[in-house]
């Protein structure tokens, strides 16, 4: 069993892009300073909790309508498409949940994990699905909130969801865009994207936990790769360094795993919700866990999974764990650095999940607001 963890360093292949990013950042006009969020007595950001409540109600109302039109029957755990306002669609596949043995980097780090049912996006999120979120139609503060003079003019709550400020340079790093995975967002940006998609669709979305991601990747297998142990088959399923990839690729060109998910190995790294801890069994303090999630307590490191197009076969295994690091923002001259972009990661993306059970308002709030992003 391969157990691999790595702090990924800045790619040496893009020095000119890094220089452009720095130059563009210096030239960019200064945005309005951030306003410290108002915290309620329970510690929640008042504006973000208001939004969470509004989206939670929207989701419950939509589910009630769907149930009524389905003669009172509950929604089935089957594949479906979720259209976005931009015209892009999310292809979602069911994962019935279940149990698996979760092995860590250390010999004694073995957990028996059970997971509730969920849906996961069939492919990595593409630019077509992500860019309308990234390119906000209204001016924003560095924290992604609308500028004060705009707030009274906003008619739709979706514009109160924090969204990225303009990027310094096209985040494709000189590679192709159409049909390709969205790149270089921070975990905070990925969380806010999930909130934005939830508002649009009436379905609750979030990043997968590390356990959910690995369970979906393994697709019932207990080997390092979803296709088995034959290294000669790797090129049929994955874009990776050993396959001579020189750039990221349009998702869905390789073979899927047994559950129908594409590019779980290679192409781009994918965000999870979890803070990185070296020993998960030690963290949870027990042998069996249900729906495990290591909630963030600091900006770094978080866990990314799947490996990317530059990495070795070992680094794209189902068990491999990769840690986010401040080095990913080394080309950002802002102080504090951007909440939204990693300026040196032309191999970092995301896919998203929809749990079968709708969470509470408080749970939604915590999934979308890690509470540590301001320190990045």
How does the language model describe each region?
Residues 1-10:
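N-terminal secretory signal peptides that target proteins for export/translocation
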């Amino acid at each position: 069993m391969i157990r691999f963890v790595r702090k990924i360093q800045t790619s040496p292949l893009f020095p000119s892009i890094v220089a452009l990013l720095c130059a563009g950042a210096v030239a960019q006009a200064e945005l309005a300073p951030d306003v410290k969020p108002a915290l309620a007595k329970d510690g929640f950001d008042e504006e973000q909790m208001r939004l969470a409540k509004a989206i939670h109600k929207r989701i419950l109302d939509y589910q009630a309508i769907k149930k009524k039109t389905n003669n009172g029957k509950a929604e089935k755990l089957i594949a479906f498409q979720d259209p976005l306002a931009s015209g892009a669609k999310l292809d979602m596949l069911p994962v019935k949940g279940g149990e698996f043995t979760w092995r860590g980097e250390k010999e004694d780090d073995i957990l028996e994990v059970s997971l509730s049912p969920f849906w996961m996006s069939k492919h990595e999120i593409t630019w077509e699905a992500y860019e309308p979120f990234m390119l906000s139609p209204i001016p924003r503060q560095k924290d992604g909130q609308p500028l004060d003079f705009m707030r009274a003019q906003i008619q739709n709550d979706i514009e109160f969801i924090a969204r990225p400020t303009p990027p310094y340079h096209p985040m494709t790093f000189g590679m192709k865009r159409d049909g390709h995975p969205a790149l270089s967002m921070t975990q905070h940006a990925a969380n806010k994207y999930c909130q934005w998609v939830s508002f649009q669709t009436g379905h609750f979305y979030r990043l997968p936990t590390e356990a959910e991601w690995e369970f979906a990747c393994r697709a019932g297998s207990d080997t390092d790769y979803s296709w088995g142990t034959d290294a000669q088959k790797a090129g049929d399923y994955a874009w990776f360094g050993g396959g001579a990839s020189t750039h990221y690729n349009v998702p869905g060109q390789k073979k899927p795993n047994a559950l129908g998910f594409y590019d779980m190995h290679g192409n781009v790294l994918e965000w999870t919700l979890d803070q990185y801890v070296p020993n998960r069994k030690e963290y949870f303090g027990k042998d069996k866990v249900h729906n495990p999630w290591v909630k963030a307590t600091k900006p770094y490191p978080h866990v990314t999974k799947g490996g990317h197009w530059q990495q070795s076969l070992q680094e794209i295994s189902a068990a491999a764990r990769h840690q986010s690091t401040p080095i990913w923002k080394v080309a950002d001259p802002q102080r504090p650095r951007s909440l939204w972009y990693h300026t040196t990661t032309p191999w970092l993306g995301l896919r998203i999940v929809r749990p079968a059970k709708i969470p509470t308002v408080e749970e939604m709030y915590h999934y979308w607001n890690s509470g540590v992003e301001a320190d990045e």
